[in-house]
Amino acid sequence: MPQWEIVGGADKGGVLVREGQALGSPATKDRLSTGATVEEVELVGERLHYKLVEGTGTGPAEGWISIKVSGKELAVPKEEDVEIGPPGEAGPVEVDEDLKKKIEAEHAKIKDKFELYVPKYKFLKYPLADCKMRIFCFHNAGSAESVYTGPKTPFTDWVKETGKIEMIALDFPGRDKLNKATKHTTIETLAPELLAVCLDKVSDGKPYLVWGHSVGTWVAFEWLILIRKLGLPMPKAVFLNAFPAPHMPVSMRPWHRSKKLSDDGVKEELMSWDSGHFTGAGKVVFDEPGWKDTWLPMMRADFQLYDEYKFKHTGVPKFDFPIHAWHMEGEHFNKKDMIEMWKDWTSGTWDTCAMEKMGHLTCFYNPEYKKQYFTKVVENMKGYYDAL
């Protein structure tokens, strides 16, 4: 029988169970616990007759639940675990012509919205008449492009001094100028959209680098997988910091799935990512009404980008460009060996290190740490720029 996972009800102690299919039938005394697995006996519209899989949760052994309430999922089909493994050896990848046509068609529809996704583009006086290189930046969860484009940093200063580098720092929908856009909860839809909107900036042959942080590394990874499938140029190098490689087994993921967390649980999870930041400058995100109106919905969506991520690239050819993947020494969840798994993804040069004392976010928000972090990134990027 098909199985379902209970993902709703965290704020109420579980999902309401009724004795019969009708919404007016008697409710059971106990609720079905969030995280439980149930077997489908019968599915009628959005009403599920279930039997609880022993040992997976608590609540009535059998009953009826709604799989959705007001558009919010309470139960989702349980997917079979897919074997996850490393890439294969480097080699050619056949162009996916259907995918290419699809991305090109989407580009034609949304290319005029480019500056909504890259809000600093005109402010930084782009496009450049003599652009020599571009740097594509992908931000972390709950953040925005401003972590890269903030003024007077070693990164922005260097880019400005060259006068020949365009910084393409992308916003994910649901923030800044895209505040009213639907937030993505899966990289499978986010990465193609981010490629479509800037396709002409990748396909024109200008050399480029990629810098991703935290979940931005997985978004960048899927973005690069798509670029390769389209037969477009690969980057000169990538910087994928503060997050494990995407082929790390699901069982090794140290964080909690946000779908199963109450609102207070999401707050606790966020705090755990970098308590140094969220007990300091970052604590303002918990102030009301900003927390419930802005930050909580954003975190719930952004967390799912990695919580629910399904890796589907076992055995595909590894890349041949250099990968820099650095660990933040003060991390709570991520460990150095998780970050080092990125080495599996290149046949080229590989670089890793631990950034002393830095947390998952303080590397961006602590002025001293940010200066050190950005200086090191720039020192490495200069080598690729000077070699052009």
Q: Can you say where each PLM-predicted feature lies in the sequence?
A:
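Eukaryotic intrinsically disordered and solvent-exposed regulatory patches
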Residues: 25, 36-37, 308
